[in-house]
Design a protein with these regions (language model features):
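Nucleotide and nucleotide-moiety/phosphate-recognizing core
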Residues: 27-118, 126-148, 331
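Internal gly/pro-rich beta-alpha loop/helix module
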Residues: 112-113, 118-120, 124-212
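Short acidic loop-to-helix transition motifs that present clustered carboxylates
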Residues: 99-102, 152-156, 179, 349-352
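A short, aliphatic-rich alpha-helical micro-motif
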Residues: 108-112, 165, 310-311, 336
Length: 492
């Protein structure tokens, strides 16, 4: 973001104008959350984040807010000094901390809204003693807290939190999301994150090393093309799903049903013959390819049949509840290297490719991987903690290195093709259940089978999957909802 701001300045913008736009956007966001005519305390640091805070104070005065500013030192930058002087001319009260600690704490105690404008995206390490003290007091208040850009105390690039940190209800950031908004533990301190424009053009944003957007921004208002009245089932493609094993029939059922709900013209379920009666009894609209098996897992002796079916289909899902052994590895590798249709690898499809990860680059068709953090750790040979600490970097680098689309699941699922990084904001904690991933894989596979660009299919699938989960949570609750309930709430 710092490089992007400099590029904007090099192309005619000024830092003072960017600060004015940032502060105005943040103030208007706070008004949207009910701050008009309320008591607002703004805590300003010494740098440009504090400068944003002074602008916020001026703008809020126009909305009849009772504004007080707590200053953690004198402004040090030219633009921050200028905006502090403007705020003083409007008779906005200034309290210095820690010099007048008692007054500052009394203001915080009585505030309806508090703005954290102490540190911005350049912060590293831990808060100093005075800032940590005021952050701790703010966190005990009942006020609505808004952070400017990122909560003070979090590391912007790595999401680290070292000691006390402001905890926000709302974070207003500018132009693009930052890693701290999607990484742990910093994400838990951001509350809801909104991205505001400061007038930097899309052309300049696109010059960035990579673009970080939300899925809804990327997709736009129209998720899918209209279904023409002259269409037939062939128009919407055939999905081959190689899924299920003994004890995991449910994965096949959820994947298949979700694919049907997501619009595929035909869904062909290839599965061990022993579980065929169970799955067929639940998916009466699907067609089936029973497979030879060993110990309840599909046997590699049907590899040629599966490769042929894959190439006759429009997309392939591999792995949901499939099991993992040498046979599944052979099935996955044969389809990966011989199929010319989009392939979605999930669950045991991912586990089966781990020993043969070099084959991803040899795939003849677009490949989408949908790992959860544990599967991502196996792909990389690292720990889950390392994945969670570096989600953005890992998603980008893995997708770029292996020429795939990667869906790194979790709260704020990430999707990347190696050039763009998308953050999904739909979904809820009620979706953290076995089976949710099977539903997602079926949805993405269904969209790809309908001829939608595979990367867009992944993005659209993740977004719609989260929306379905949100509808289900509203209809039932996060505690009681199940993945099978979510399937009934899929809508495009």
């Amino acid at each position: 973001m710092r490089d992007l701001e400099q590029t904007a300045v090099d192309n005619g913008a000024t830092y003072i104008k960017l600060m004015e736009k940032a502060g105005t956007a943040a103030a208007e966001a706070l008004i949207k959350y009910g701050a008009e005519s309320k008591k607002v305390v703004i805590i300003c640091g010494k740098g440009n984040n504090g400068g944003d805070g002074y602008v916020i104070g001026r703008v809020l005065k126009k909305y009849n807010c009772k504004v007080d500013i707590i200053r953690l030192g004198e402004p040090r930058t030219t633009d921050s000094k200028l905006n502090a002087e403007k705020a003083i001319k409007l008779d906005i009260a200034m309290v210095n901390f820690p010099e007048d600690k008692e007054t500052a704490f009394e203001l915080i105690k009585n505030a309806d809204y508090i703005v954290d404008a102490v540190y911005g995206i350049g912060f590293r390490g831990a808060l100093d003693e005075n800032t940590a003290e005021i952050a701790k007091f703010v966190n005990t208040s009942k006020a609505f807290v808004m952070a400017v850009d990122i909560p003070s105390g979090v590391g912007c690039d790595d999401g680290s939190v070292k000691g006390e940190c402001f905890k926000a209800n709302l974070t207003v950031t500018f132009t693009t999301l930052k890693p701290a908004h999607i990484l742990y533990p910093s994400m838990d301190y951001c509350g809801k994150t909104e991205v505001a424009s400061v007038g930097i053009s899309d052309e300049l944003i696109n010059l960035s090393e990579y673009i970080m957007q939300t899925t809804d921004e990327f997709l736009g208002e129209k998720l899918l093309p209209e279904r023409k009245i002259s269409s037939n089932k062939g128009t919407f493609g055939t999905l081959l799903a190689v899924v299920g094993s003994y004890g995991m029939a449910g994965a096949a059922i959820m994947c298949g049903k979700a694919a049907q709900r997501s619009g595929a013209g035909l869904v062909n379920i290839a599965l061990p013959k022993s579980i065929y009666p169970i799955v067929a009894g639940k998916l009466i609209e699907a067609v089936f390819t029973p497979l030879a098996e060993k110990n309840g897992i599909s046997s590699a002796e049907d590899c040629n049949k599966l490769v042929s079916l894959a190439n006759k289909s429009n997309a392939v899902v591999l792995g949901c509840g499939m099991g993992h052994n040498e046979d599944t590895e052979k099935i996955v590798c044969e389809i990966l290297t011989n199929c010319k249709k989009p392939i979605i690898l999930d669950a045991d499809g991912i586990n089966s490719i781990v020993p043969h990860i070099h084959l991803l680059k040899k795939a003849k068709a677009p490949v989408i991987l949908t790992p959860h953090p544990g599967e991502m750790a196996r792909l990389l040979g690292c720990t889950v903690a390392e994945v969670q600490q570096n989600r953005a970097e890992i998603a980008l680098n893995f997708a770029k290195e292996h020429n795939v689309s990667l869906v790194l699941k979790g709260a704020n699922t990430l999707i990347s093709d190696g050039n763009i990084l998308l953050v999904n904001r739909t979904g809820n904690a009620g979706m953290a259940r076995g089976g949710s991933g099977d539903v997602l894989a079926g949805m993405i596979g269904s969209l790809a089978a309908q001829g939608i660009n595979p990367f867009r299919a992944a993005v659209c699938g993740v977004y719609a999957h989260g929306l379905a989960g949100d509808r289900t949570a509203k209809r039932l609750s996060e505690t009681t909802m199940l993945p099978t309930d979510m399937i009934e709430d899929i809508s495009f």
